[in-house]
Amino acid sequence: MLNSAMSVVILAAGKGTRMYSDIPKVLHTLAGKPMVQHVIDAATKLGAAQVHLVYGHGGELLKQTLKDDKLNWVLQAEQLGTGHAMQQAAPFFSDDEDILMLYGDVPLISVETLQRLRDAKPQGGIGLLTVKLDDPSGYGRITRENGKVTGIVEHKDATDEQRQIQEINTGILIANGADLKRWLSKLTNNNAQGEYYITDIIALAYQEGREIAAVHPARISETDGVNNRLQLSRLERIYQAEQAEKLLLSGVMLRDPARFDLRGTLYCGMDVEIDANVIIEGYVTLGHRVKIGAGCIIKNSVIGDDCEISPYSVVEDAHLEAACTIGPFARLRPGAELLAGAHVGNFVEMKKARLGKGSKAGHLTYLGDAEIGDNVNIGAGTITCNYDGANKFKTVIGDDVFVGSDTQLVAPVTVGKGATIAAGTTVTRNVADNELVLSRVPQVHKQGWQRPVKKK
């Protein structure tokens, strides 16, 4: 039966010794964000009125990283078991709300599974998430009597007969706040580990005649926890395979789904093609018929219709209008903007710069803090000299300008419409419309000159 109010407790106090890291275990990333953030996001989407985060090791780093004003931080100074962790959070529970218990190192739990668990929770009882494993070694076993759940026995406390049970406890459960506080107050540490097990509340509820409803997740991987980097890497591949499958089924052509990483949110138009070893980070939008070449990294960017990004290009915090072409080996840094039909070629870098409609920067160029008009040609080796060691300055280039190769534009400087900058020129003053500008050292010819010969 579904109550109108629900809060979530996320257990995240473990040190994660087997990660061999100074970083708290739950802050290790999966798909580009901390494991615990995945769990917080699921709780938020589920409609949690309050999220209580039980922390211990690395608490300050957790707070600095998560920076969520809506979290209620609950300290577990000593790690004395899951029951003890829940006891620390219990004073914050309202009697008339449901409490859902989650884990910061179980990052793939889905909102859909949690919603089914919430819906299945009996009035006055417990909703319990369980799975069946071929090899349940090390897990708490679900005990039943006449089909009804009667309790959970931890592996170290189980008899040989109980160890044959394949249904195991995932640790995820939901119960009423008042009931949970009562059961938590009755927990003891009379077990092999000397800890307070949250699982003991199942037997307490059964003894009171309360119903325990067991629910299975859509996928077993949803309940897989992380204790070491190998397990984390396996969950990463599971997650990425699921994302790739969703994209393929929605019409996106991934040339090699096993070599695609989504570390954020991707919105795609029709007939998008993505080659191998592409990484998508943050919020990325790809318009219709966009093609992304192998080895590209796209982060927090909008790519317009019919754009093509050639292999090994990096695009970050950039905006491309329709029919732009990028790369190979191009880099668009934050603030780069390409208007329709613009081209940025190999080994070109842009930062806080706008390239106008139909304009081209073909090779070996740096455009920083620049505003470039339409139909401009930027020759190879052009550099906007935007930094004087203390401050940044802007370069403005009008429409229909031709900039020859190996040109330096020393900002602040403006080049008027239709101007031509000869190859090898250093521009230090403003250029008027339709002017030709050139600066070169005299060319010297020495007839009969002999090249030096190496001494033997």
Curated annotation (Swiss-Prot):
Q: Which reaction does it catalyse?
A: alpha-D-glucosamine 1-phosphate + acetyl-CoA = N-acetyl-alpha-D-glucosamine 1-phosphate + CoA + H(+); N-acetyl-alpha-D-glucosamine 1-phosphate + UTP + H(+) = UDP-N-acetyl-alpha-D-glucosamine + diphosphate
Q: What does this protein do?
A: Catalyzes the last two sequential reactions in the de novo biosynthetic pathway for UDP-N-acetylglucosamine (UDP-GlcNAc). The C-terminal domain catalyzes the transfer of acetyl group from acetyl coenzyme A to glucosamine-1-phosphate (GlcN-1-P) to produce N-acetylglucosamine-1-phosphate (GlcNAc-1-P), which is converted into UDP-GlcNAc by the transfer of uridine 5-monophosphate (from uridine 5-triphosphate), a reaction catalyzed by the N-terminal domain.
Describe how the cofactor binds.
Answer: Binds 1 Mg(2+) ion per subunit.
Q: What Pfam families would the database entry show?
A: Hexapep, NTP_transf_3
Q: Where does UDP-N-acetyl-alpha-D-glucosamine bind?
A: 11-14, 25, 76, 81-82, 103-105, 140, 154, 169, 227, 333, 351, 366, 377
Enzyme's top EC category: transferase
Q: What is its EC number?
A: 2.7.7.23, 2.3.1.157
Q: NCBIfam families given for it?
A: glmU, PRK09451.1
The alphabetized list of GO BP terms reads: cell morphogenesis; cell wall organization; lipid A biosynthetic process; peptidoglycan biosynthetic process; regulation of cell shape; UDP-N-acetylglucosamine biosynthetic process
Membrane-spanning regions, if any?
none
The record's family statement is: In the N-terminal section; belongs to the N-acetylglucosamine-1-phosphate uridyltransferase family.
Q: What is this protein called?
A: Bifunctional protein GlmU
Query: Gene that codes for this?
Result: glmU
Q: Which InterPro entries match?
A: Bifunctional_GlmU, GlmU-like, GlmU_C_LbH, Hexapep, Hexapep_transf_CS, MobA-like_NTP_Trfase, Nucleotide-diphossugar_trans, Trimer_LpxA-like_sf
- Compartments (UniProt record): Cytoplasm
Which keywords, in A-to-Z order, does the entry hold? Acyltransferase, Cell shape, Cell wall biogenesis/degradation, Cytoplasm, Magnesium, Metal-binding, Multifunctional enzyme, Nucleotidyltransferase, Peptidoglycan synthesis, Repeat, Transferase
List positions binding Mg(2+). Answer: D105, N227
Residues binding acetyl-CoA are A380, N386, Y387, S405, A423, R440
- Which cofactors are required for activity? Mg(2+)
Can you list the GO cellular component terms from the UniProt entry? cytoplasm; membrane
Task: Give positions of region: Pyrophosphorylase.
Answer: 1-229
Q: Where is the active site?
A: H363
**Region annotated Linker, chain positions:** 230-250
One example GO MF annotation: UDP-N-acetylglucosamine diphosphorylase activity
Quaternary assembly: Homotrimer.
Q: In which pathway does it act?
A: Nucleotide-sugar biosynthesis; UDP-N-acetyl-alpha-D-glucosamine biosynthesis; N-acetyl-alpha-D-glucosamine 1-phosphate from alpha-D-glucosamine 6-phosphate (route II): step 2/2; Nucleotide-sugar biosynthesis; UDP-N-acetyl-alpha-D-glucosamine biosynthesis; UDP-N-acetyl-alpha-D-glucosamine from N-acetyl-alpha-D-glucosamine 1-phosphate: step 1/1; Bacterial outer membrane biogenesis; LPS lipid A biosynthesis
